[in-house]
């Protein structure tokens, strides 16, 4: 077994950590093993790892029997991985892709995503995950090691954590927080506590277009201190991308719901179910030659 500390030492011998990439490498074997374990039985399954860096998590994924698809943006780390995991690459147990995970095409079929992701790409990565789901299919499970504050917002840990990120994620995923990982478990140590999040896809209700809900939520939280009556006066920026929707229909629907009590609330006052119900009422307003 290739030990995590040795893998990190070998990569750092090639170059110092790139701060612009948010490189904090997990070296605690117990945490690495636990993260992989949260994904369940990975034998023969296609697993996407984003930002493998020195390969500490990659090693544990390979030991689980997974077929690993790893996307790494750092060219030096890619070369290190090619040399260190040459046999795994030759046997196609590891497929290594050099590029930015936010713009590089992911494999069409992914059974799981398991990653220690750079903190600065956490939010945009969730958007990419969502887009991949609608273009292809959702992975059975997503296990991410992220900054604890982000984990709380992602999983809606408390009502105070409600924001567009957590609400939109909850529309299509169940999410939970698992173990905390202290700074000392990384090299170099980050300044904050980290947390493991587990996401699993849930069935979407068919009575409302989830895209309408997402756009409405984003528009409302853009002015989170305003009541919905004010923040939703203007239609969402990308509303016209939704079939049957345009600015005139939006304004007509909002006018028809002028007495709706929800409009006197602020976005953080609404639960996920309340957002769905409100958007269902929006969509059900009769369209008359608009």
Walk through the language-model features, giving the residues of each.
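Catalytic cores of RNA-modifying enzymes
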Residues: 1-219, 277-278, 283-290
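An accessory alpha-helical subdomain
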Residues: 192-195, 199-201, 206-255, 259-274, ...
């Amino acid at each position: 077994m290739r030990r995590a500390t040795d893998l990190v030492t070998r990569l750092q011998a090639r170059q110092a950590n790139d701060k612009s990439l948010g490189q904090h490498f997990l070296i605690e074997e117990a945490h690495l093993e636990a993260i992989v374990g949260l994904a369940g039985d990975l034998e023969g399954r296609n697993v996407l790892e984003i930002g493998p860096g020195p390969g500490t998590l990659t090693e544990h994924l390979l030991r689980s029997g997974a077929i690993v698809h790893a996307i790494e943006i750092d060219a030096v780390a890619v070369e290190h991985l090619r040399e260190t995991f040459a046999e795994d690459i030759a046997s196609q147990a590891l497929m290594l892709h050099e590029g930015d995970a936010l713009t590089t095409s992911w494999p069409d079929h992914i059974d799981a995503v398991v990653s220690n992701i750079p903190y600065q790409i956490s939010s945009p990565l969730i958007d990419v995950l969502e887009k991949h789901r609608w273009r292809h299919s959702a992975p059975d499970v997503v296990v991410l090691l992220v900054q604890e504050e982000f984990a709380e917002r992602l999983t809606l840990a408390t009502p105070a954590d409600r924001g567009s990120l957590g609400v939109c994620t909850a529309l299509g995923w169940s999410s939970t927080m698992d173990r905390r990982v202290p700074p000392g478990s990384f090299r170099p140590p980050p300044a904050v506590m980290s947390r493991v999040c587990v996401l699993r896809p849930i069935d979407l209700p068919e009575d409302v277009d989830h895209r309408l809900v997402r756009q409405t939520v984003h528009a409302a939280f853009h002015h989170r201190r305003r009541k919905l009556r004010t923040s939703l006066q203007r239609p969402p920026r990308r509303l016209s991308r939704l079939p049957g929707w345009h600015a005139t229909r939006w304004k007509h629907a909002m006018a028809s719901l002028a007495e709706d009590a929800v409009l006197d609330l602020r976005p953080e006052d609404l639960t996920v179910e309340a957002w769905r119900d409100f958007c269902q009422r929006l969509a059900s307003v009769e369209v008359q030659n608009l």
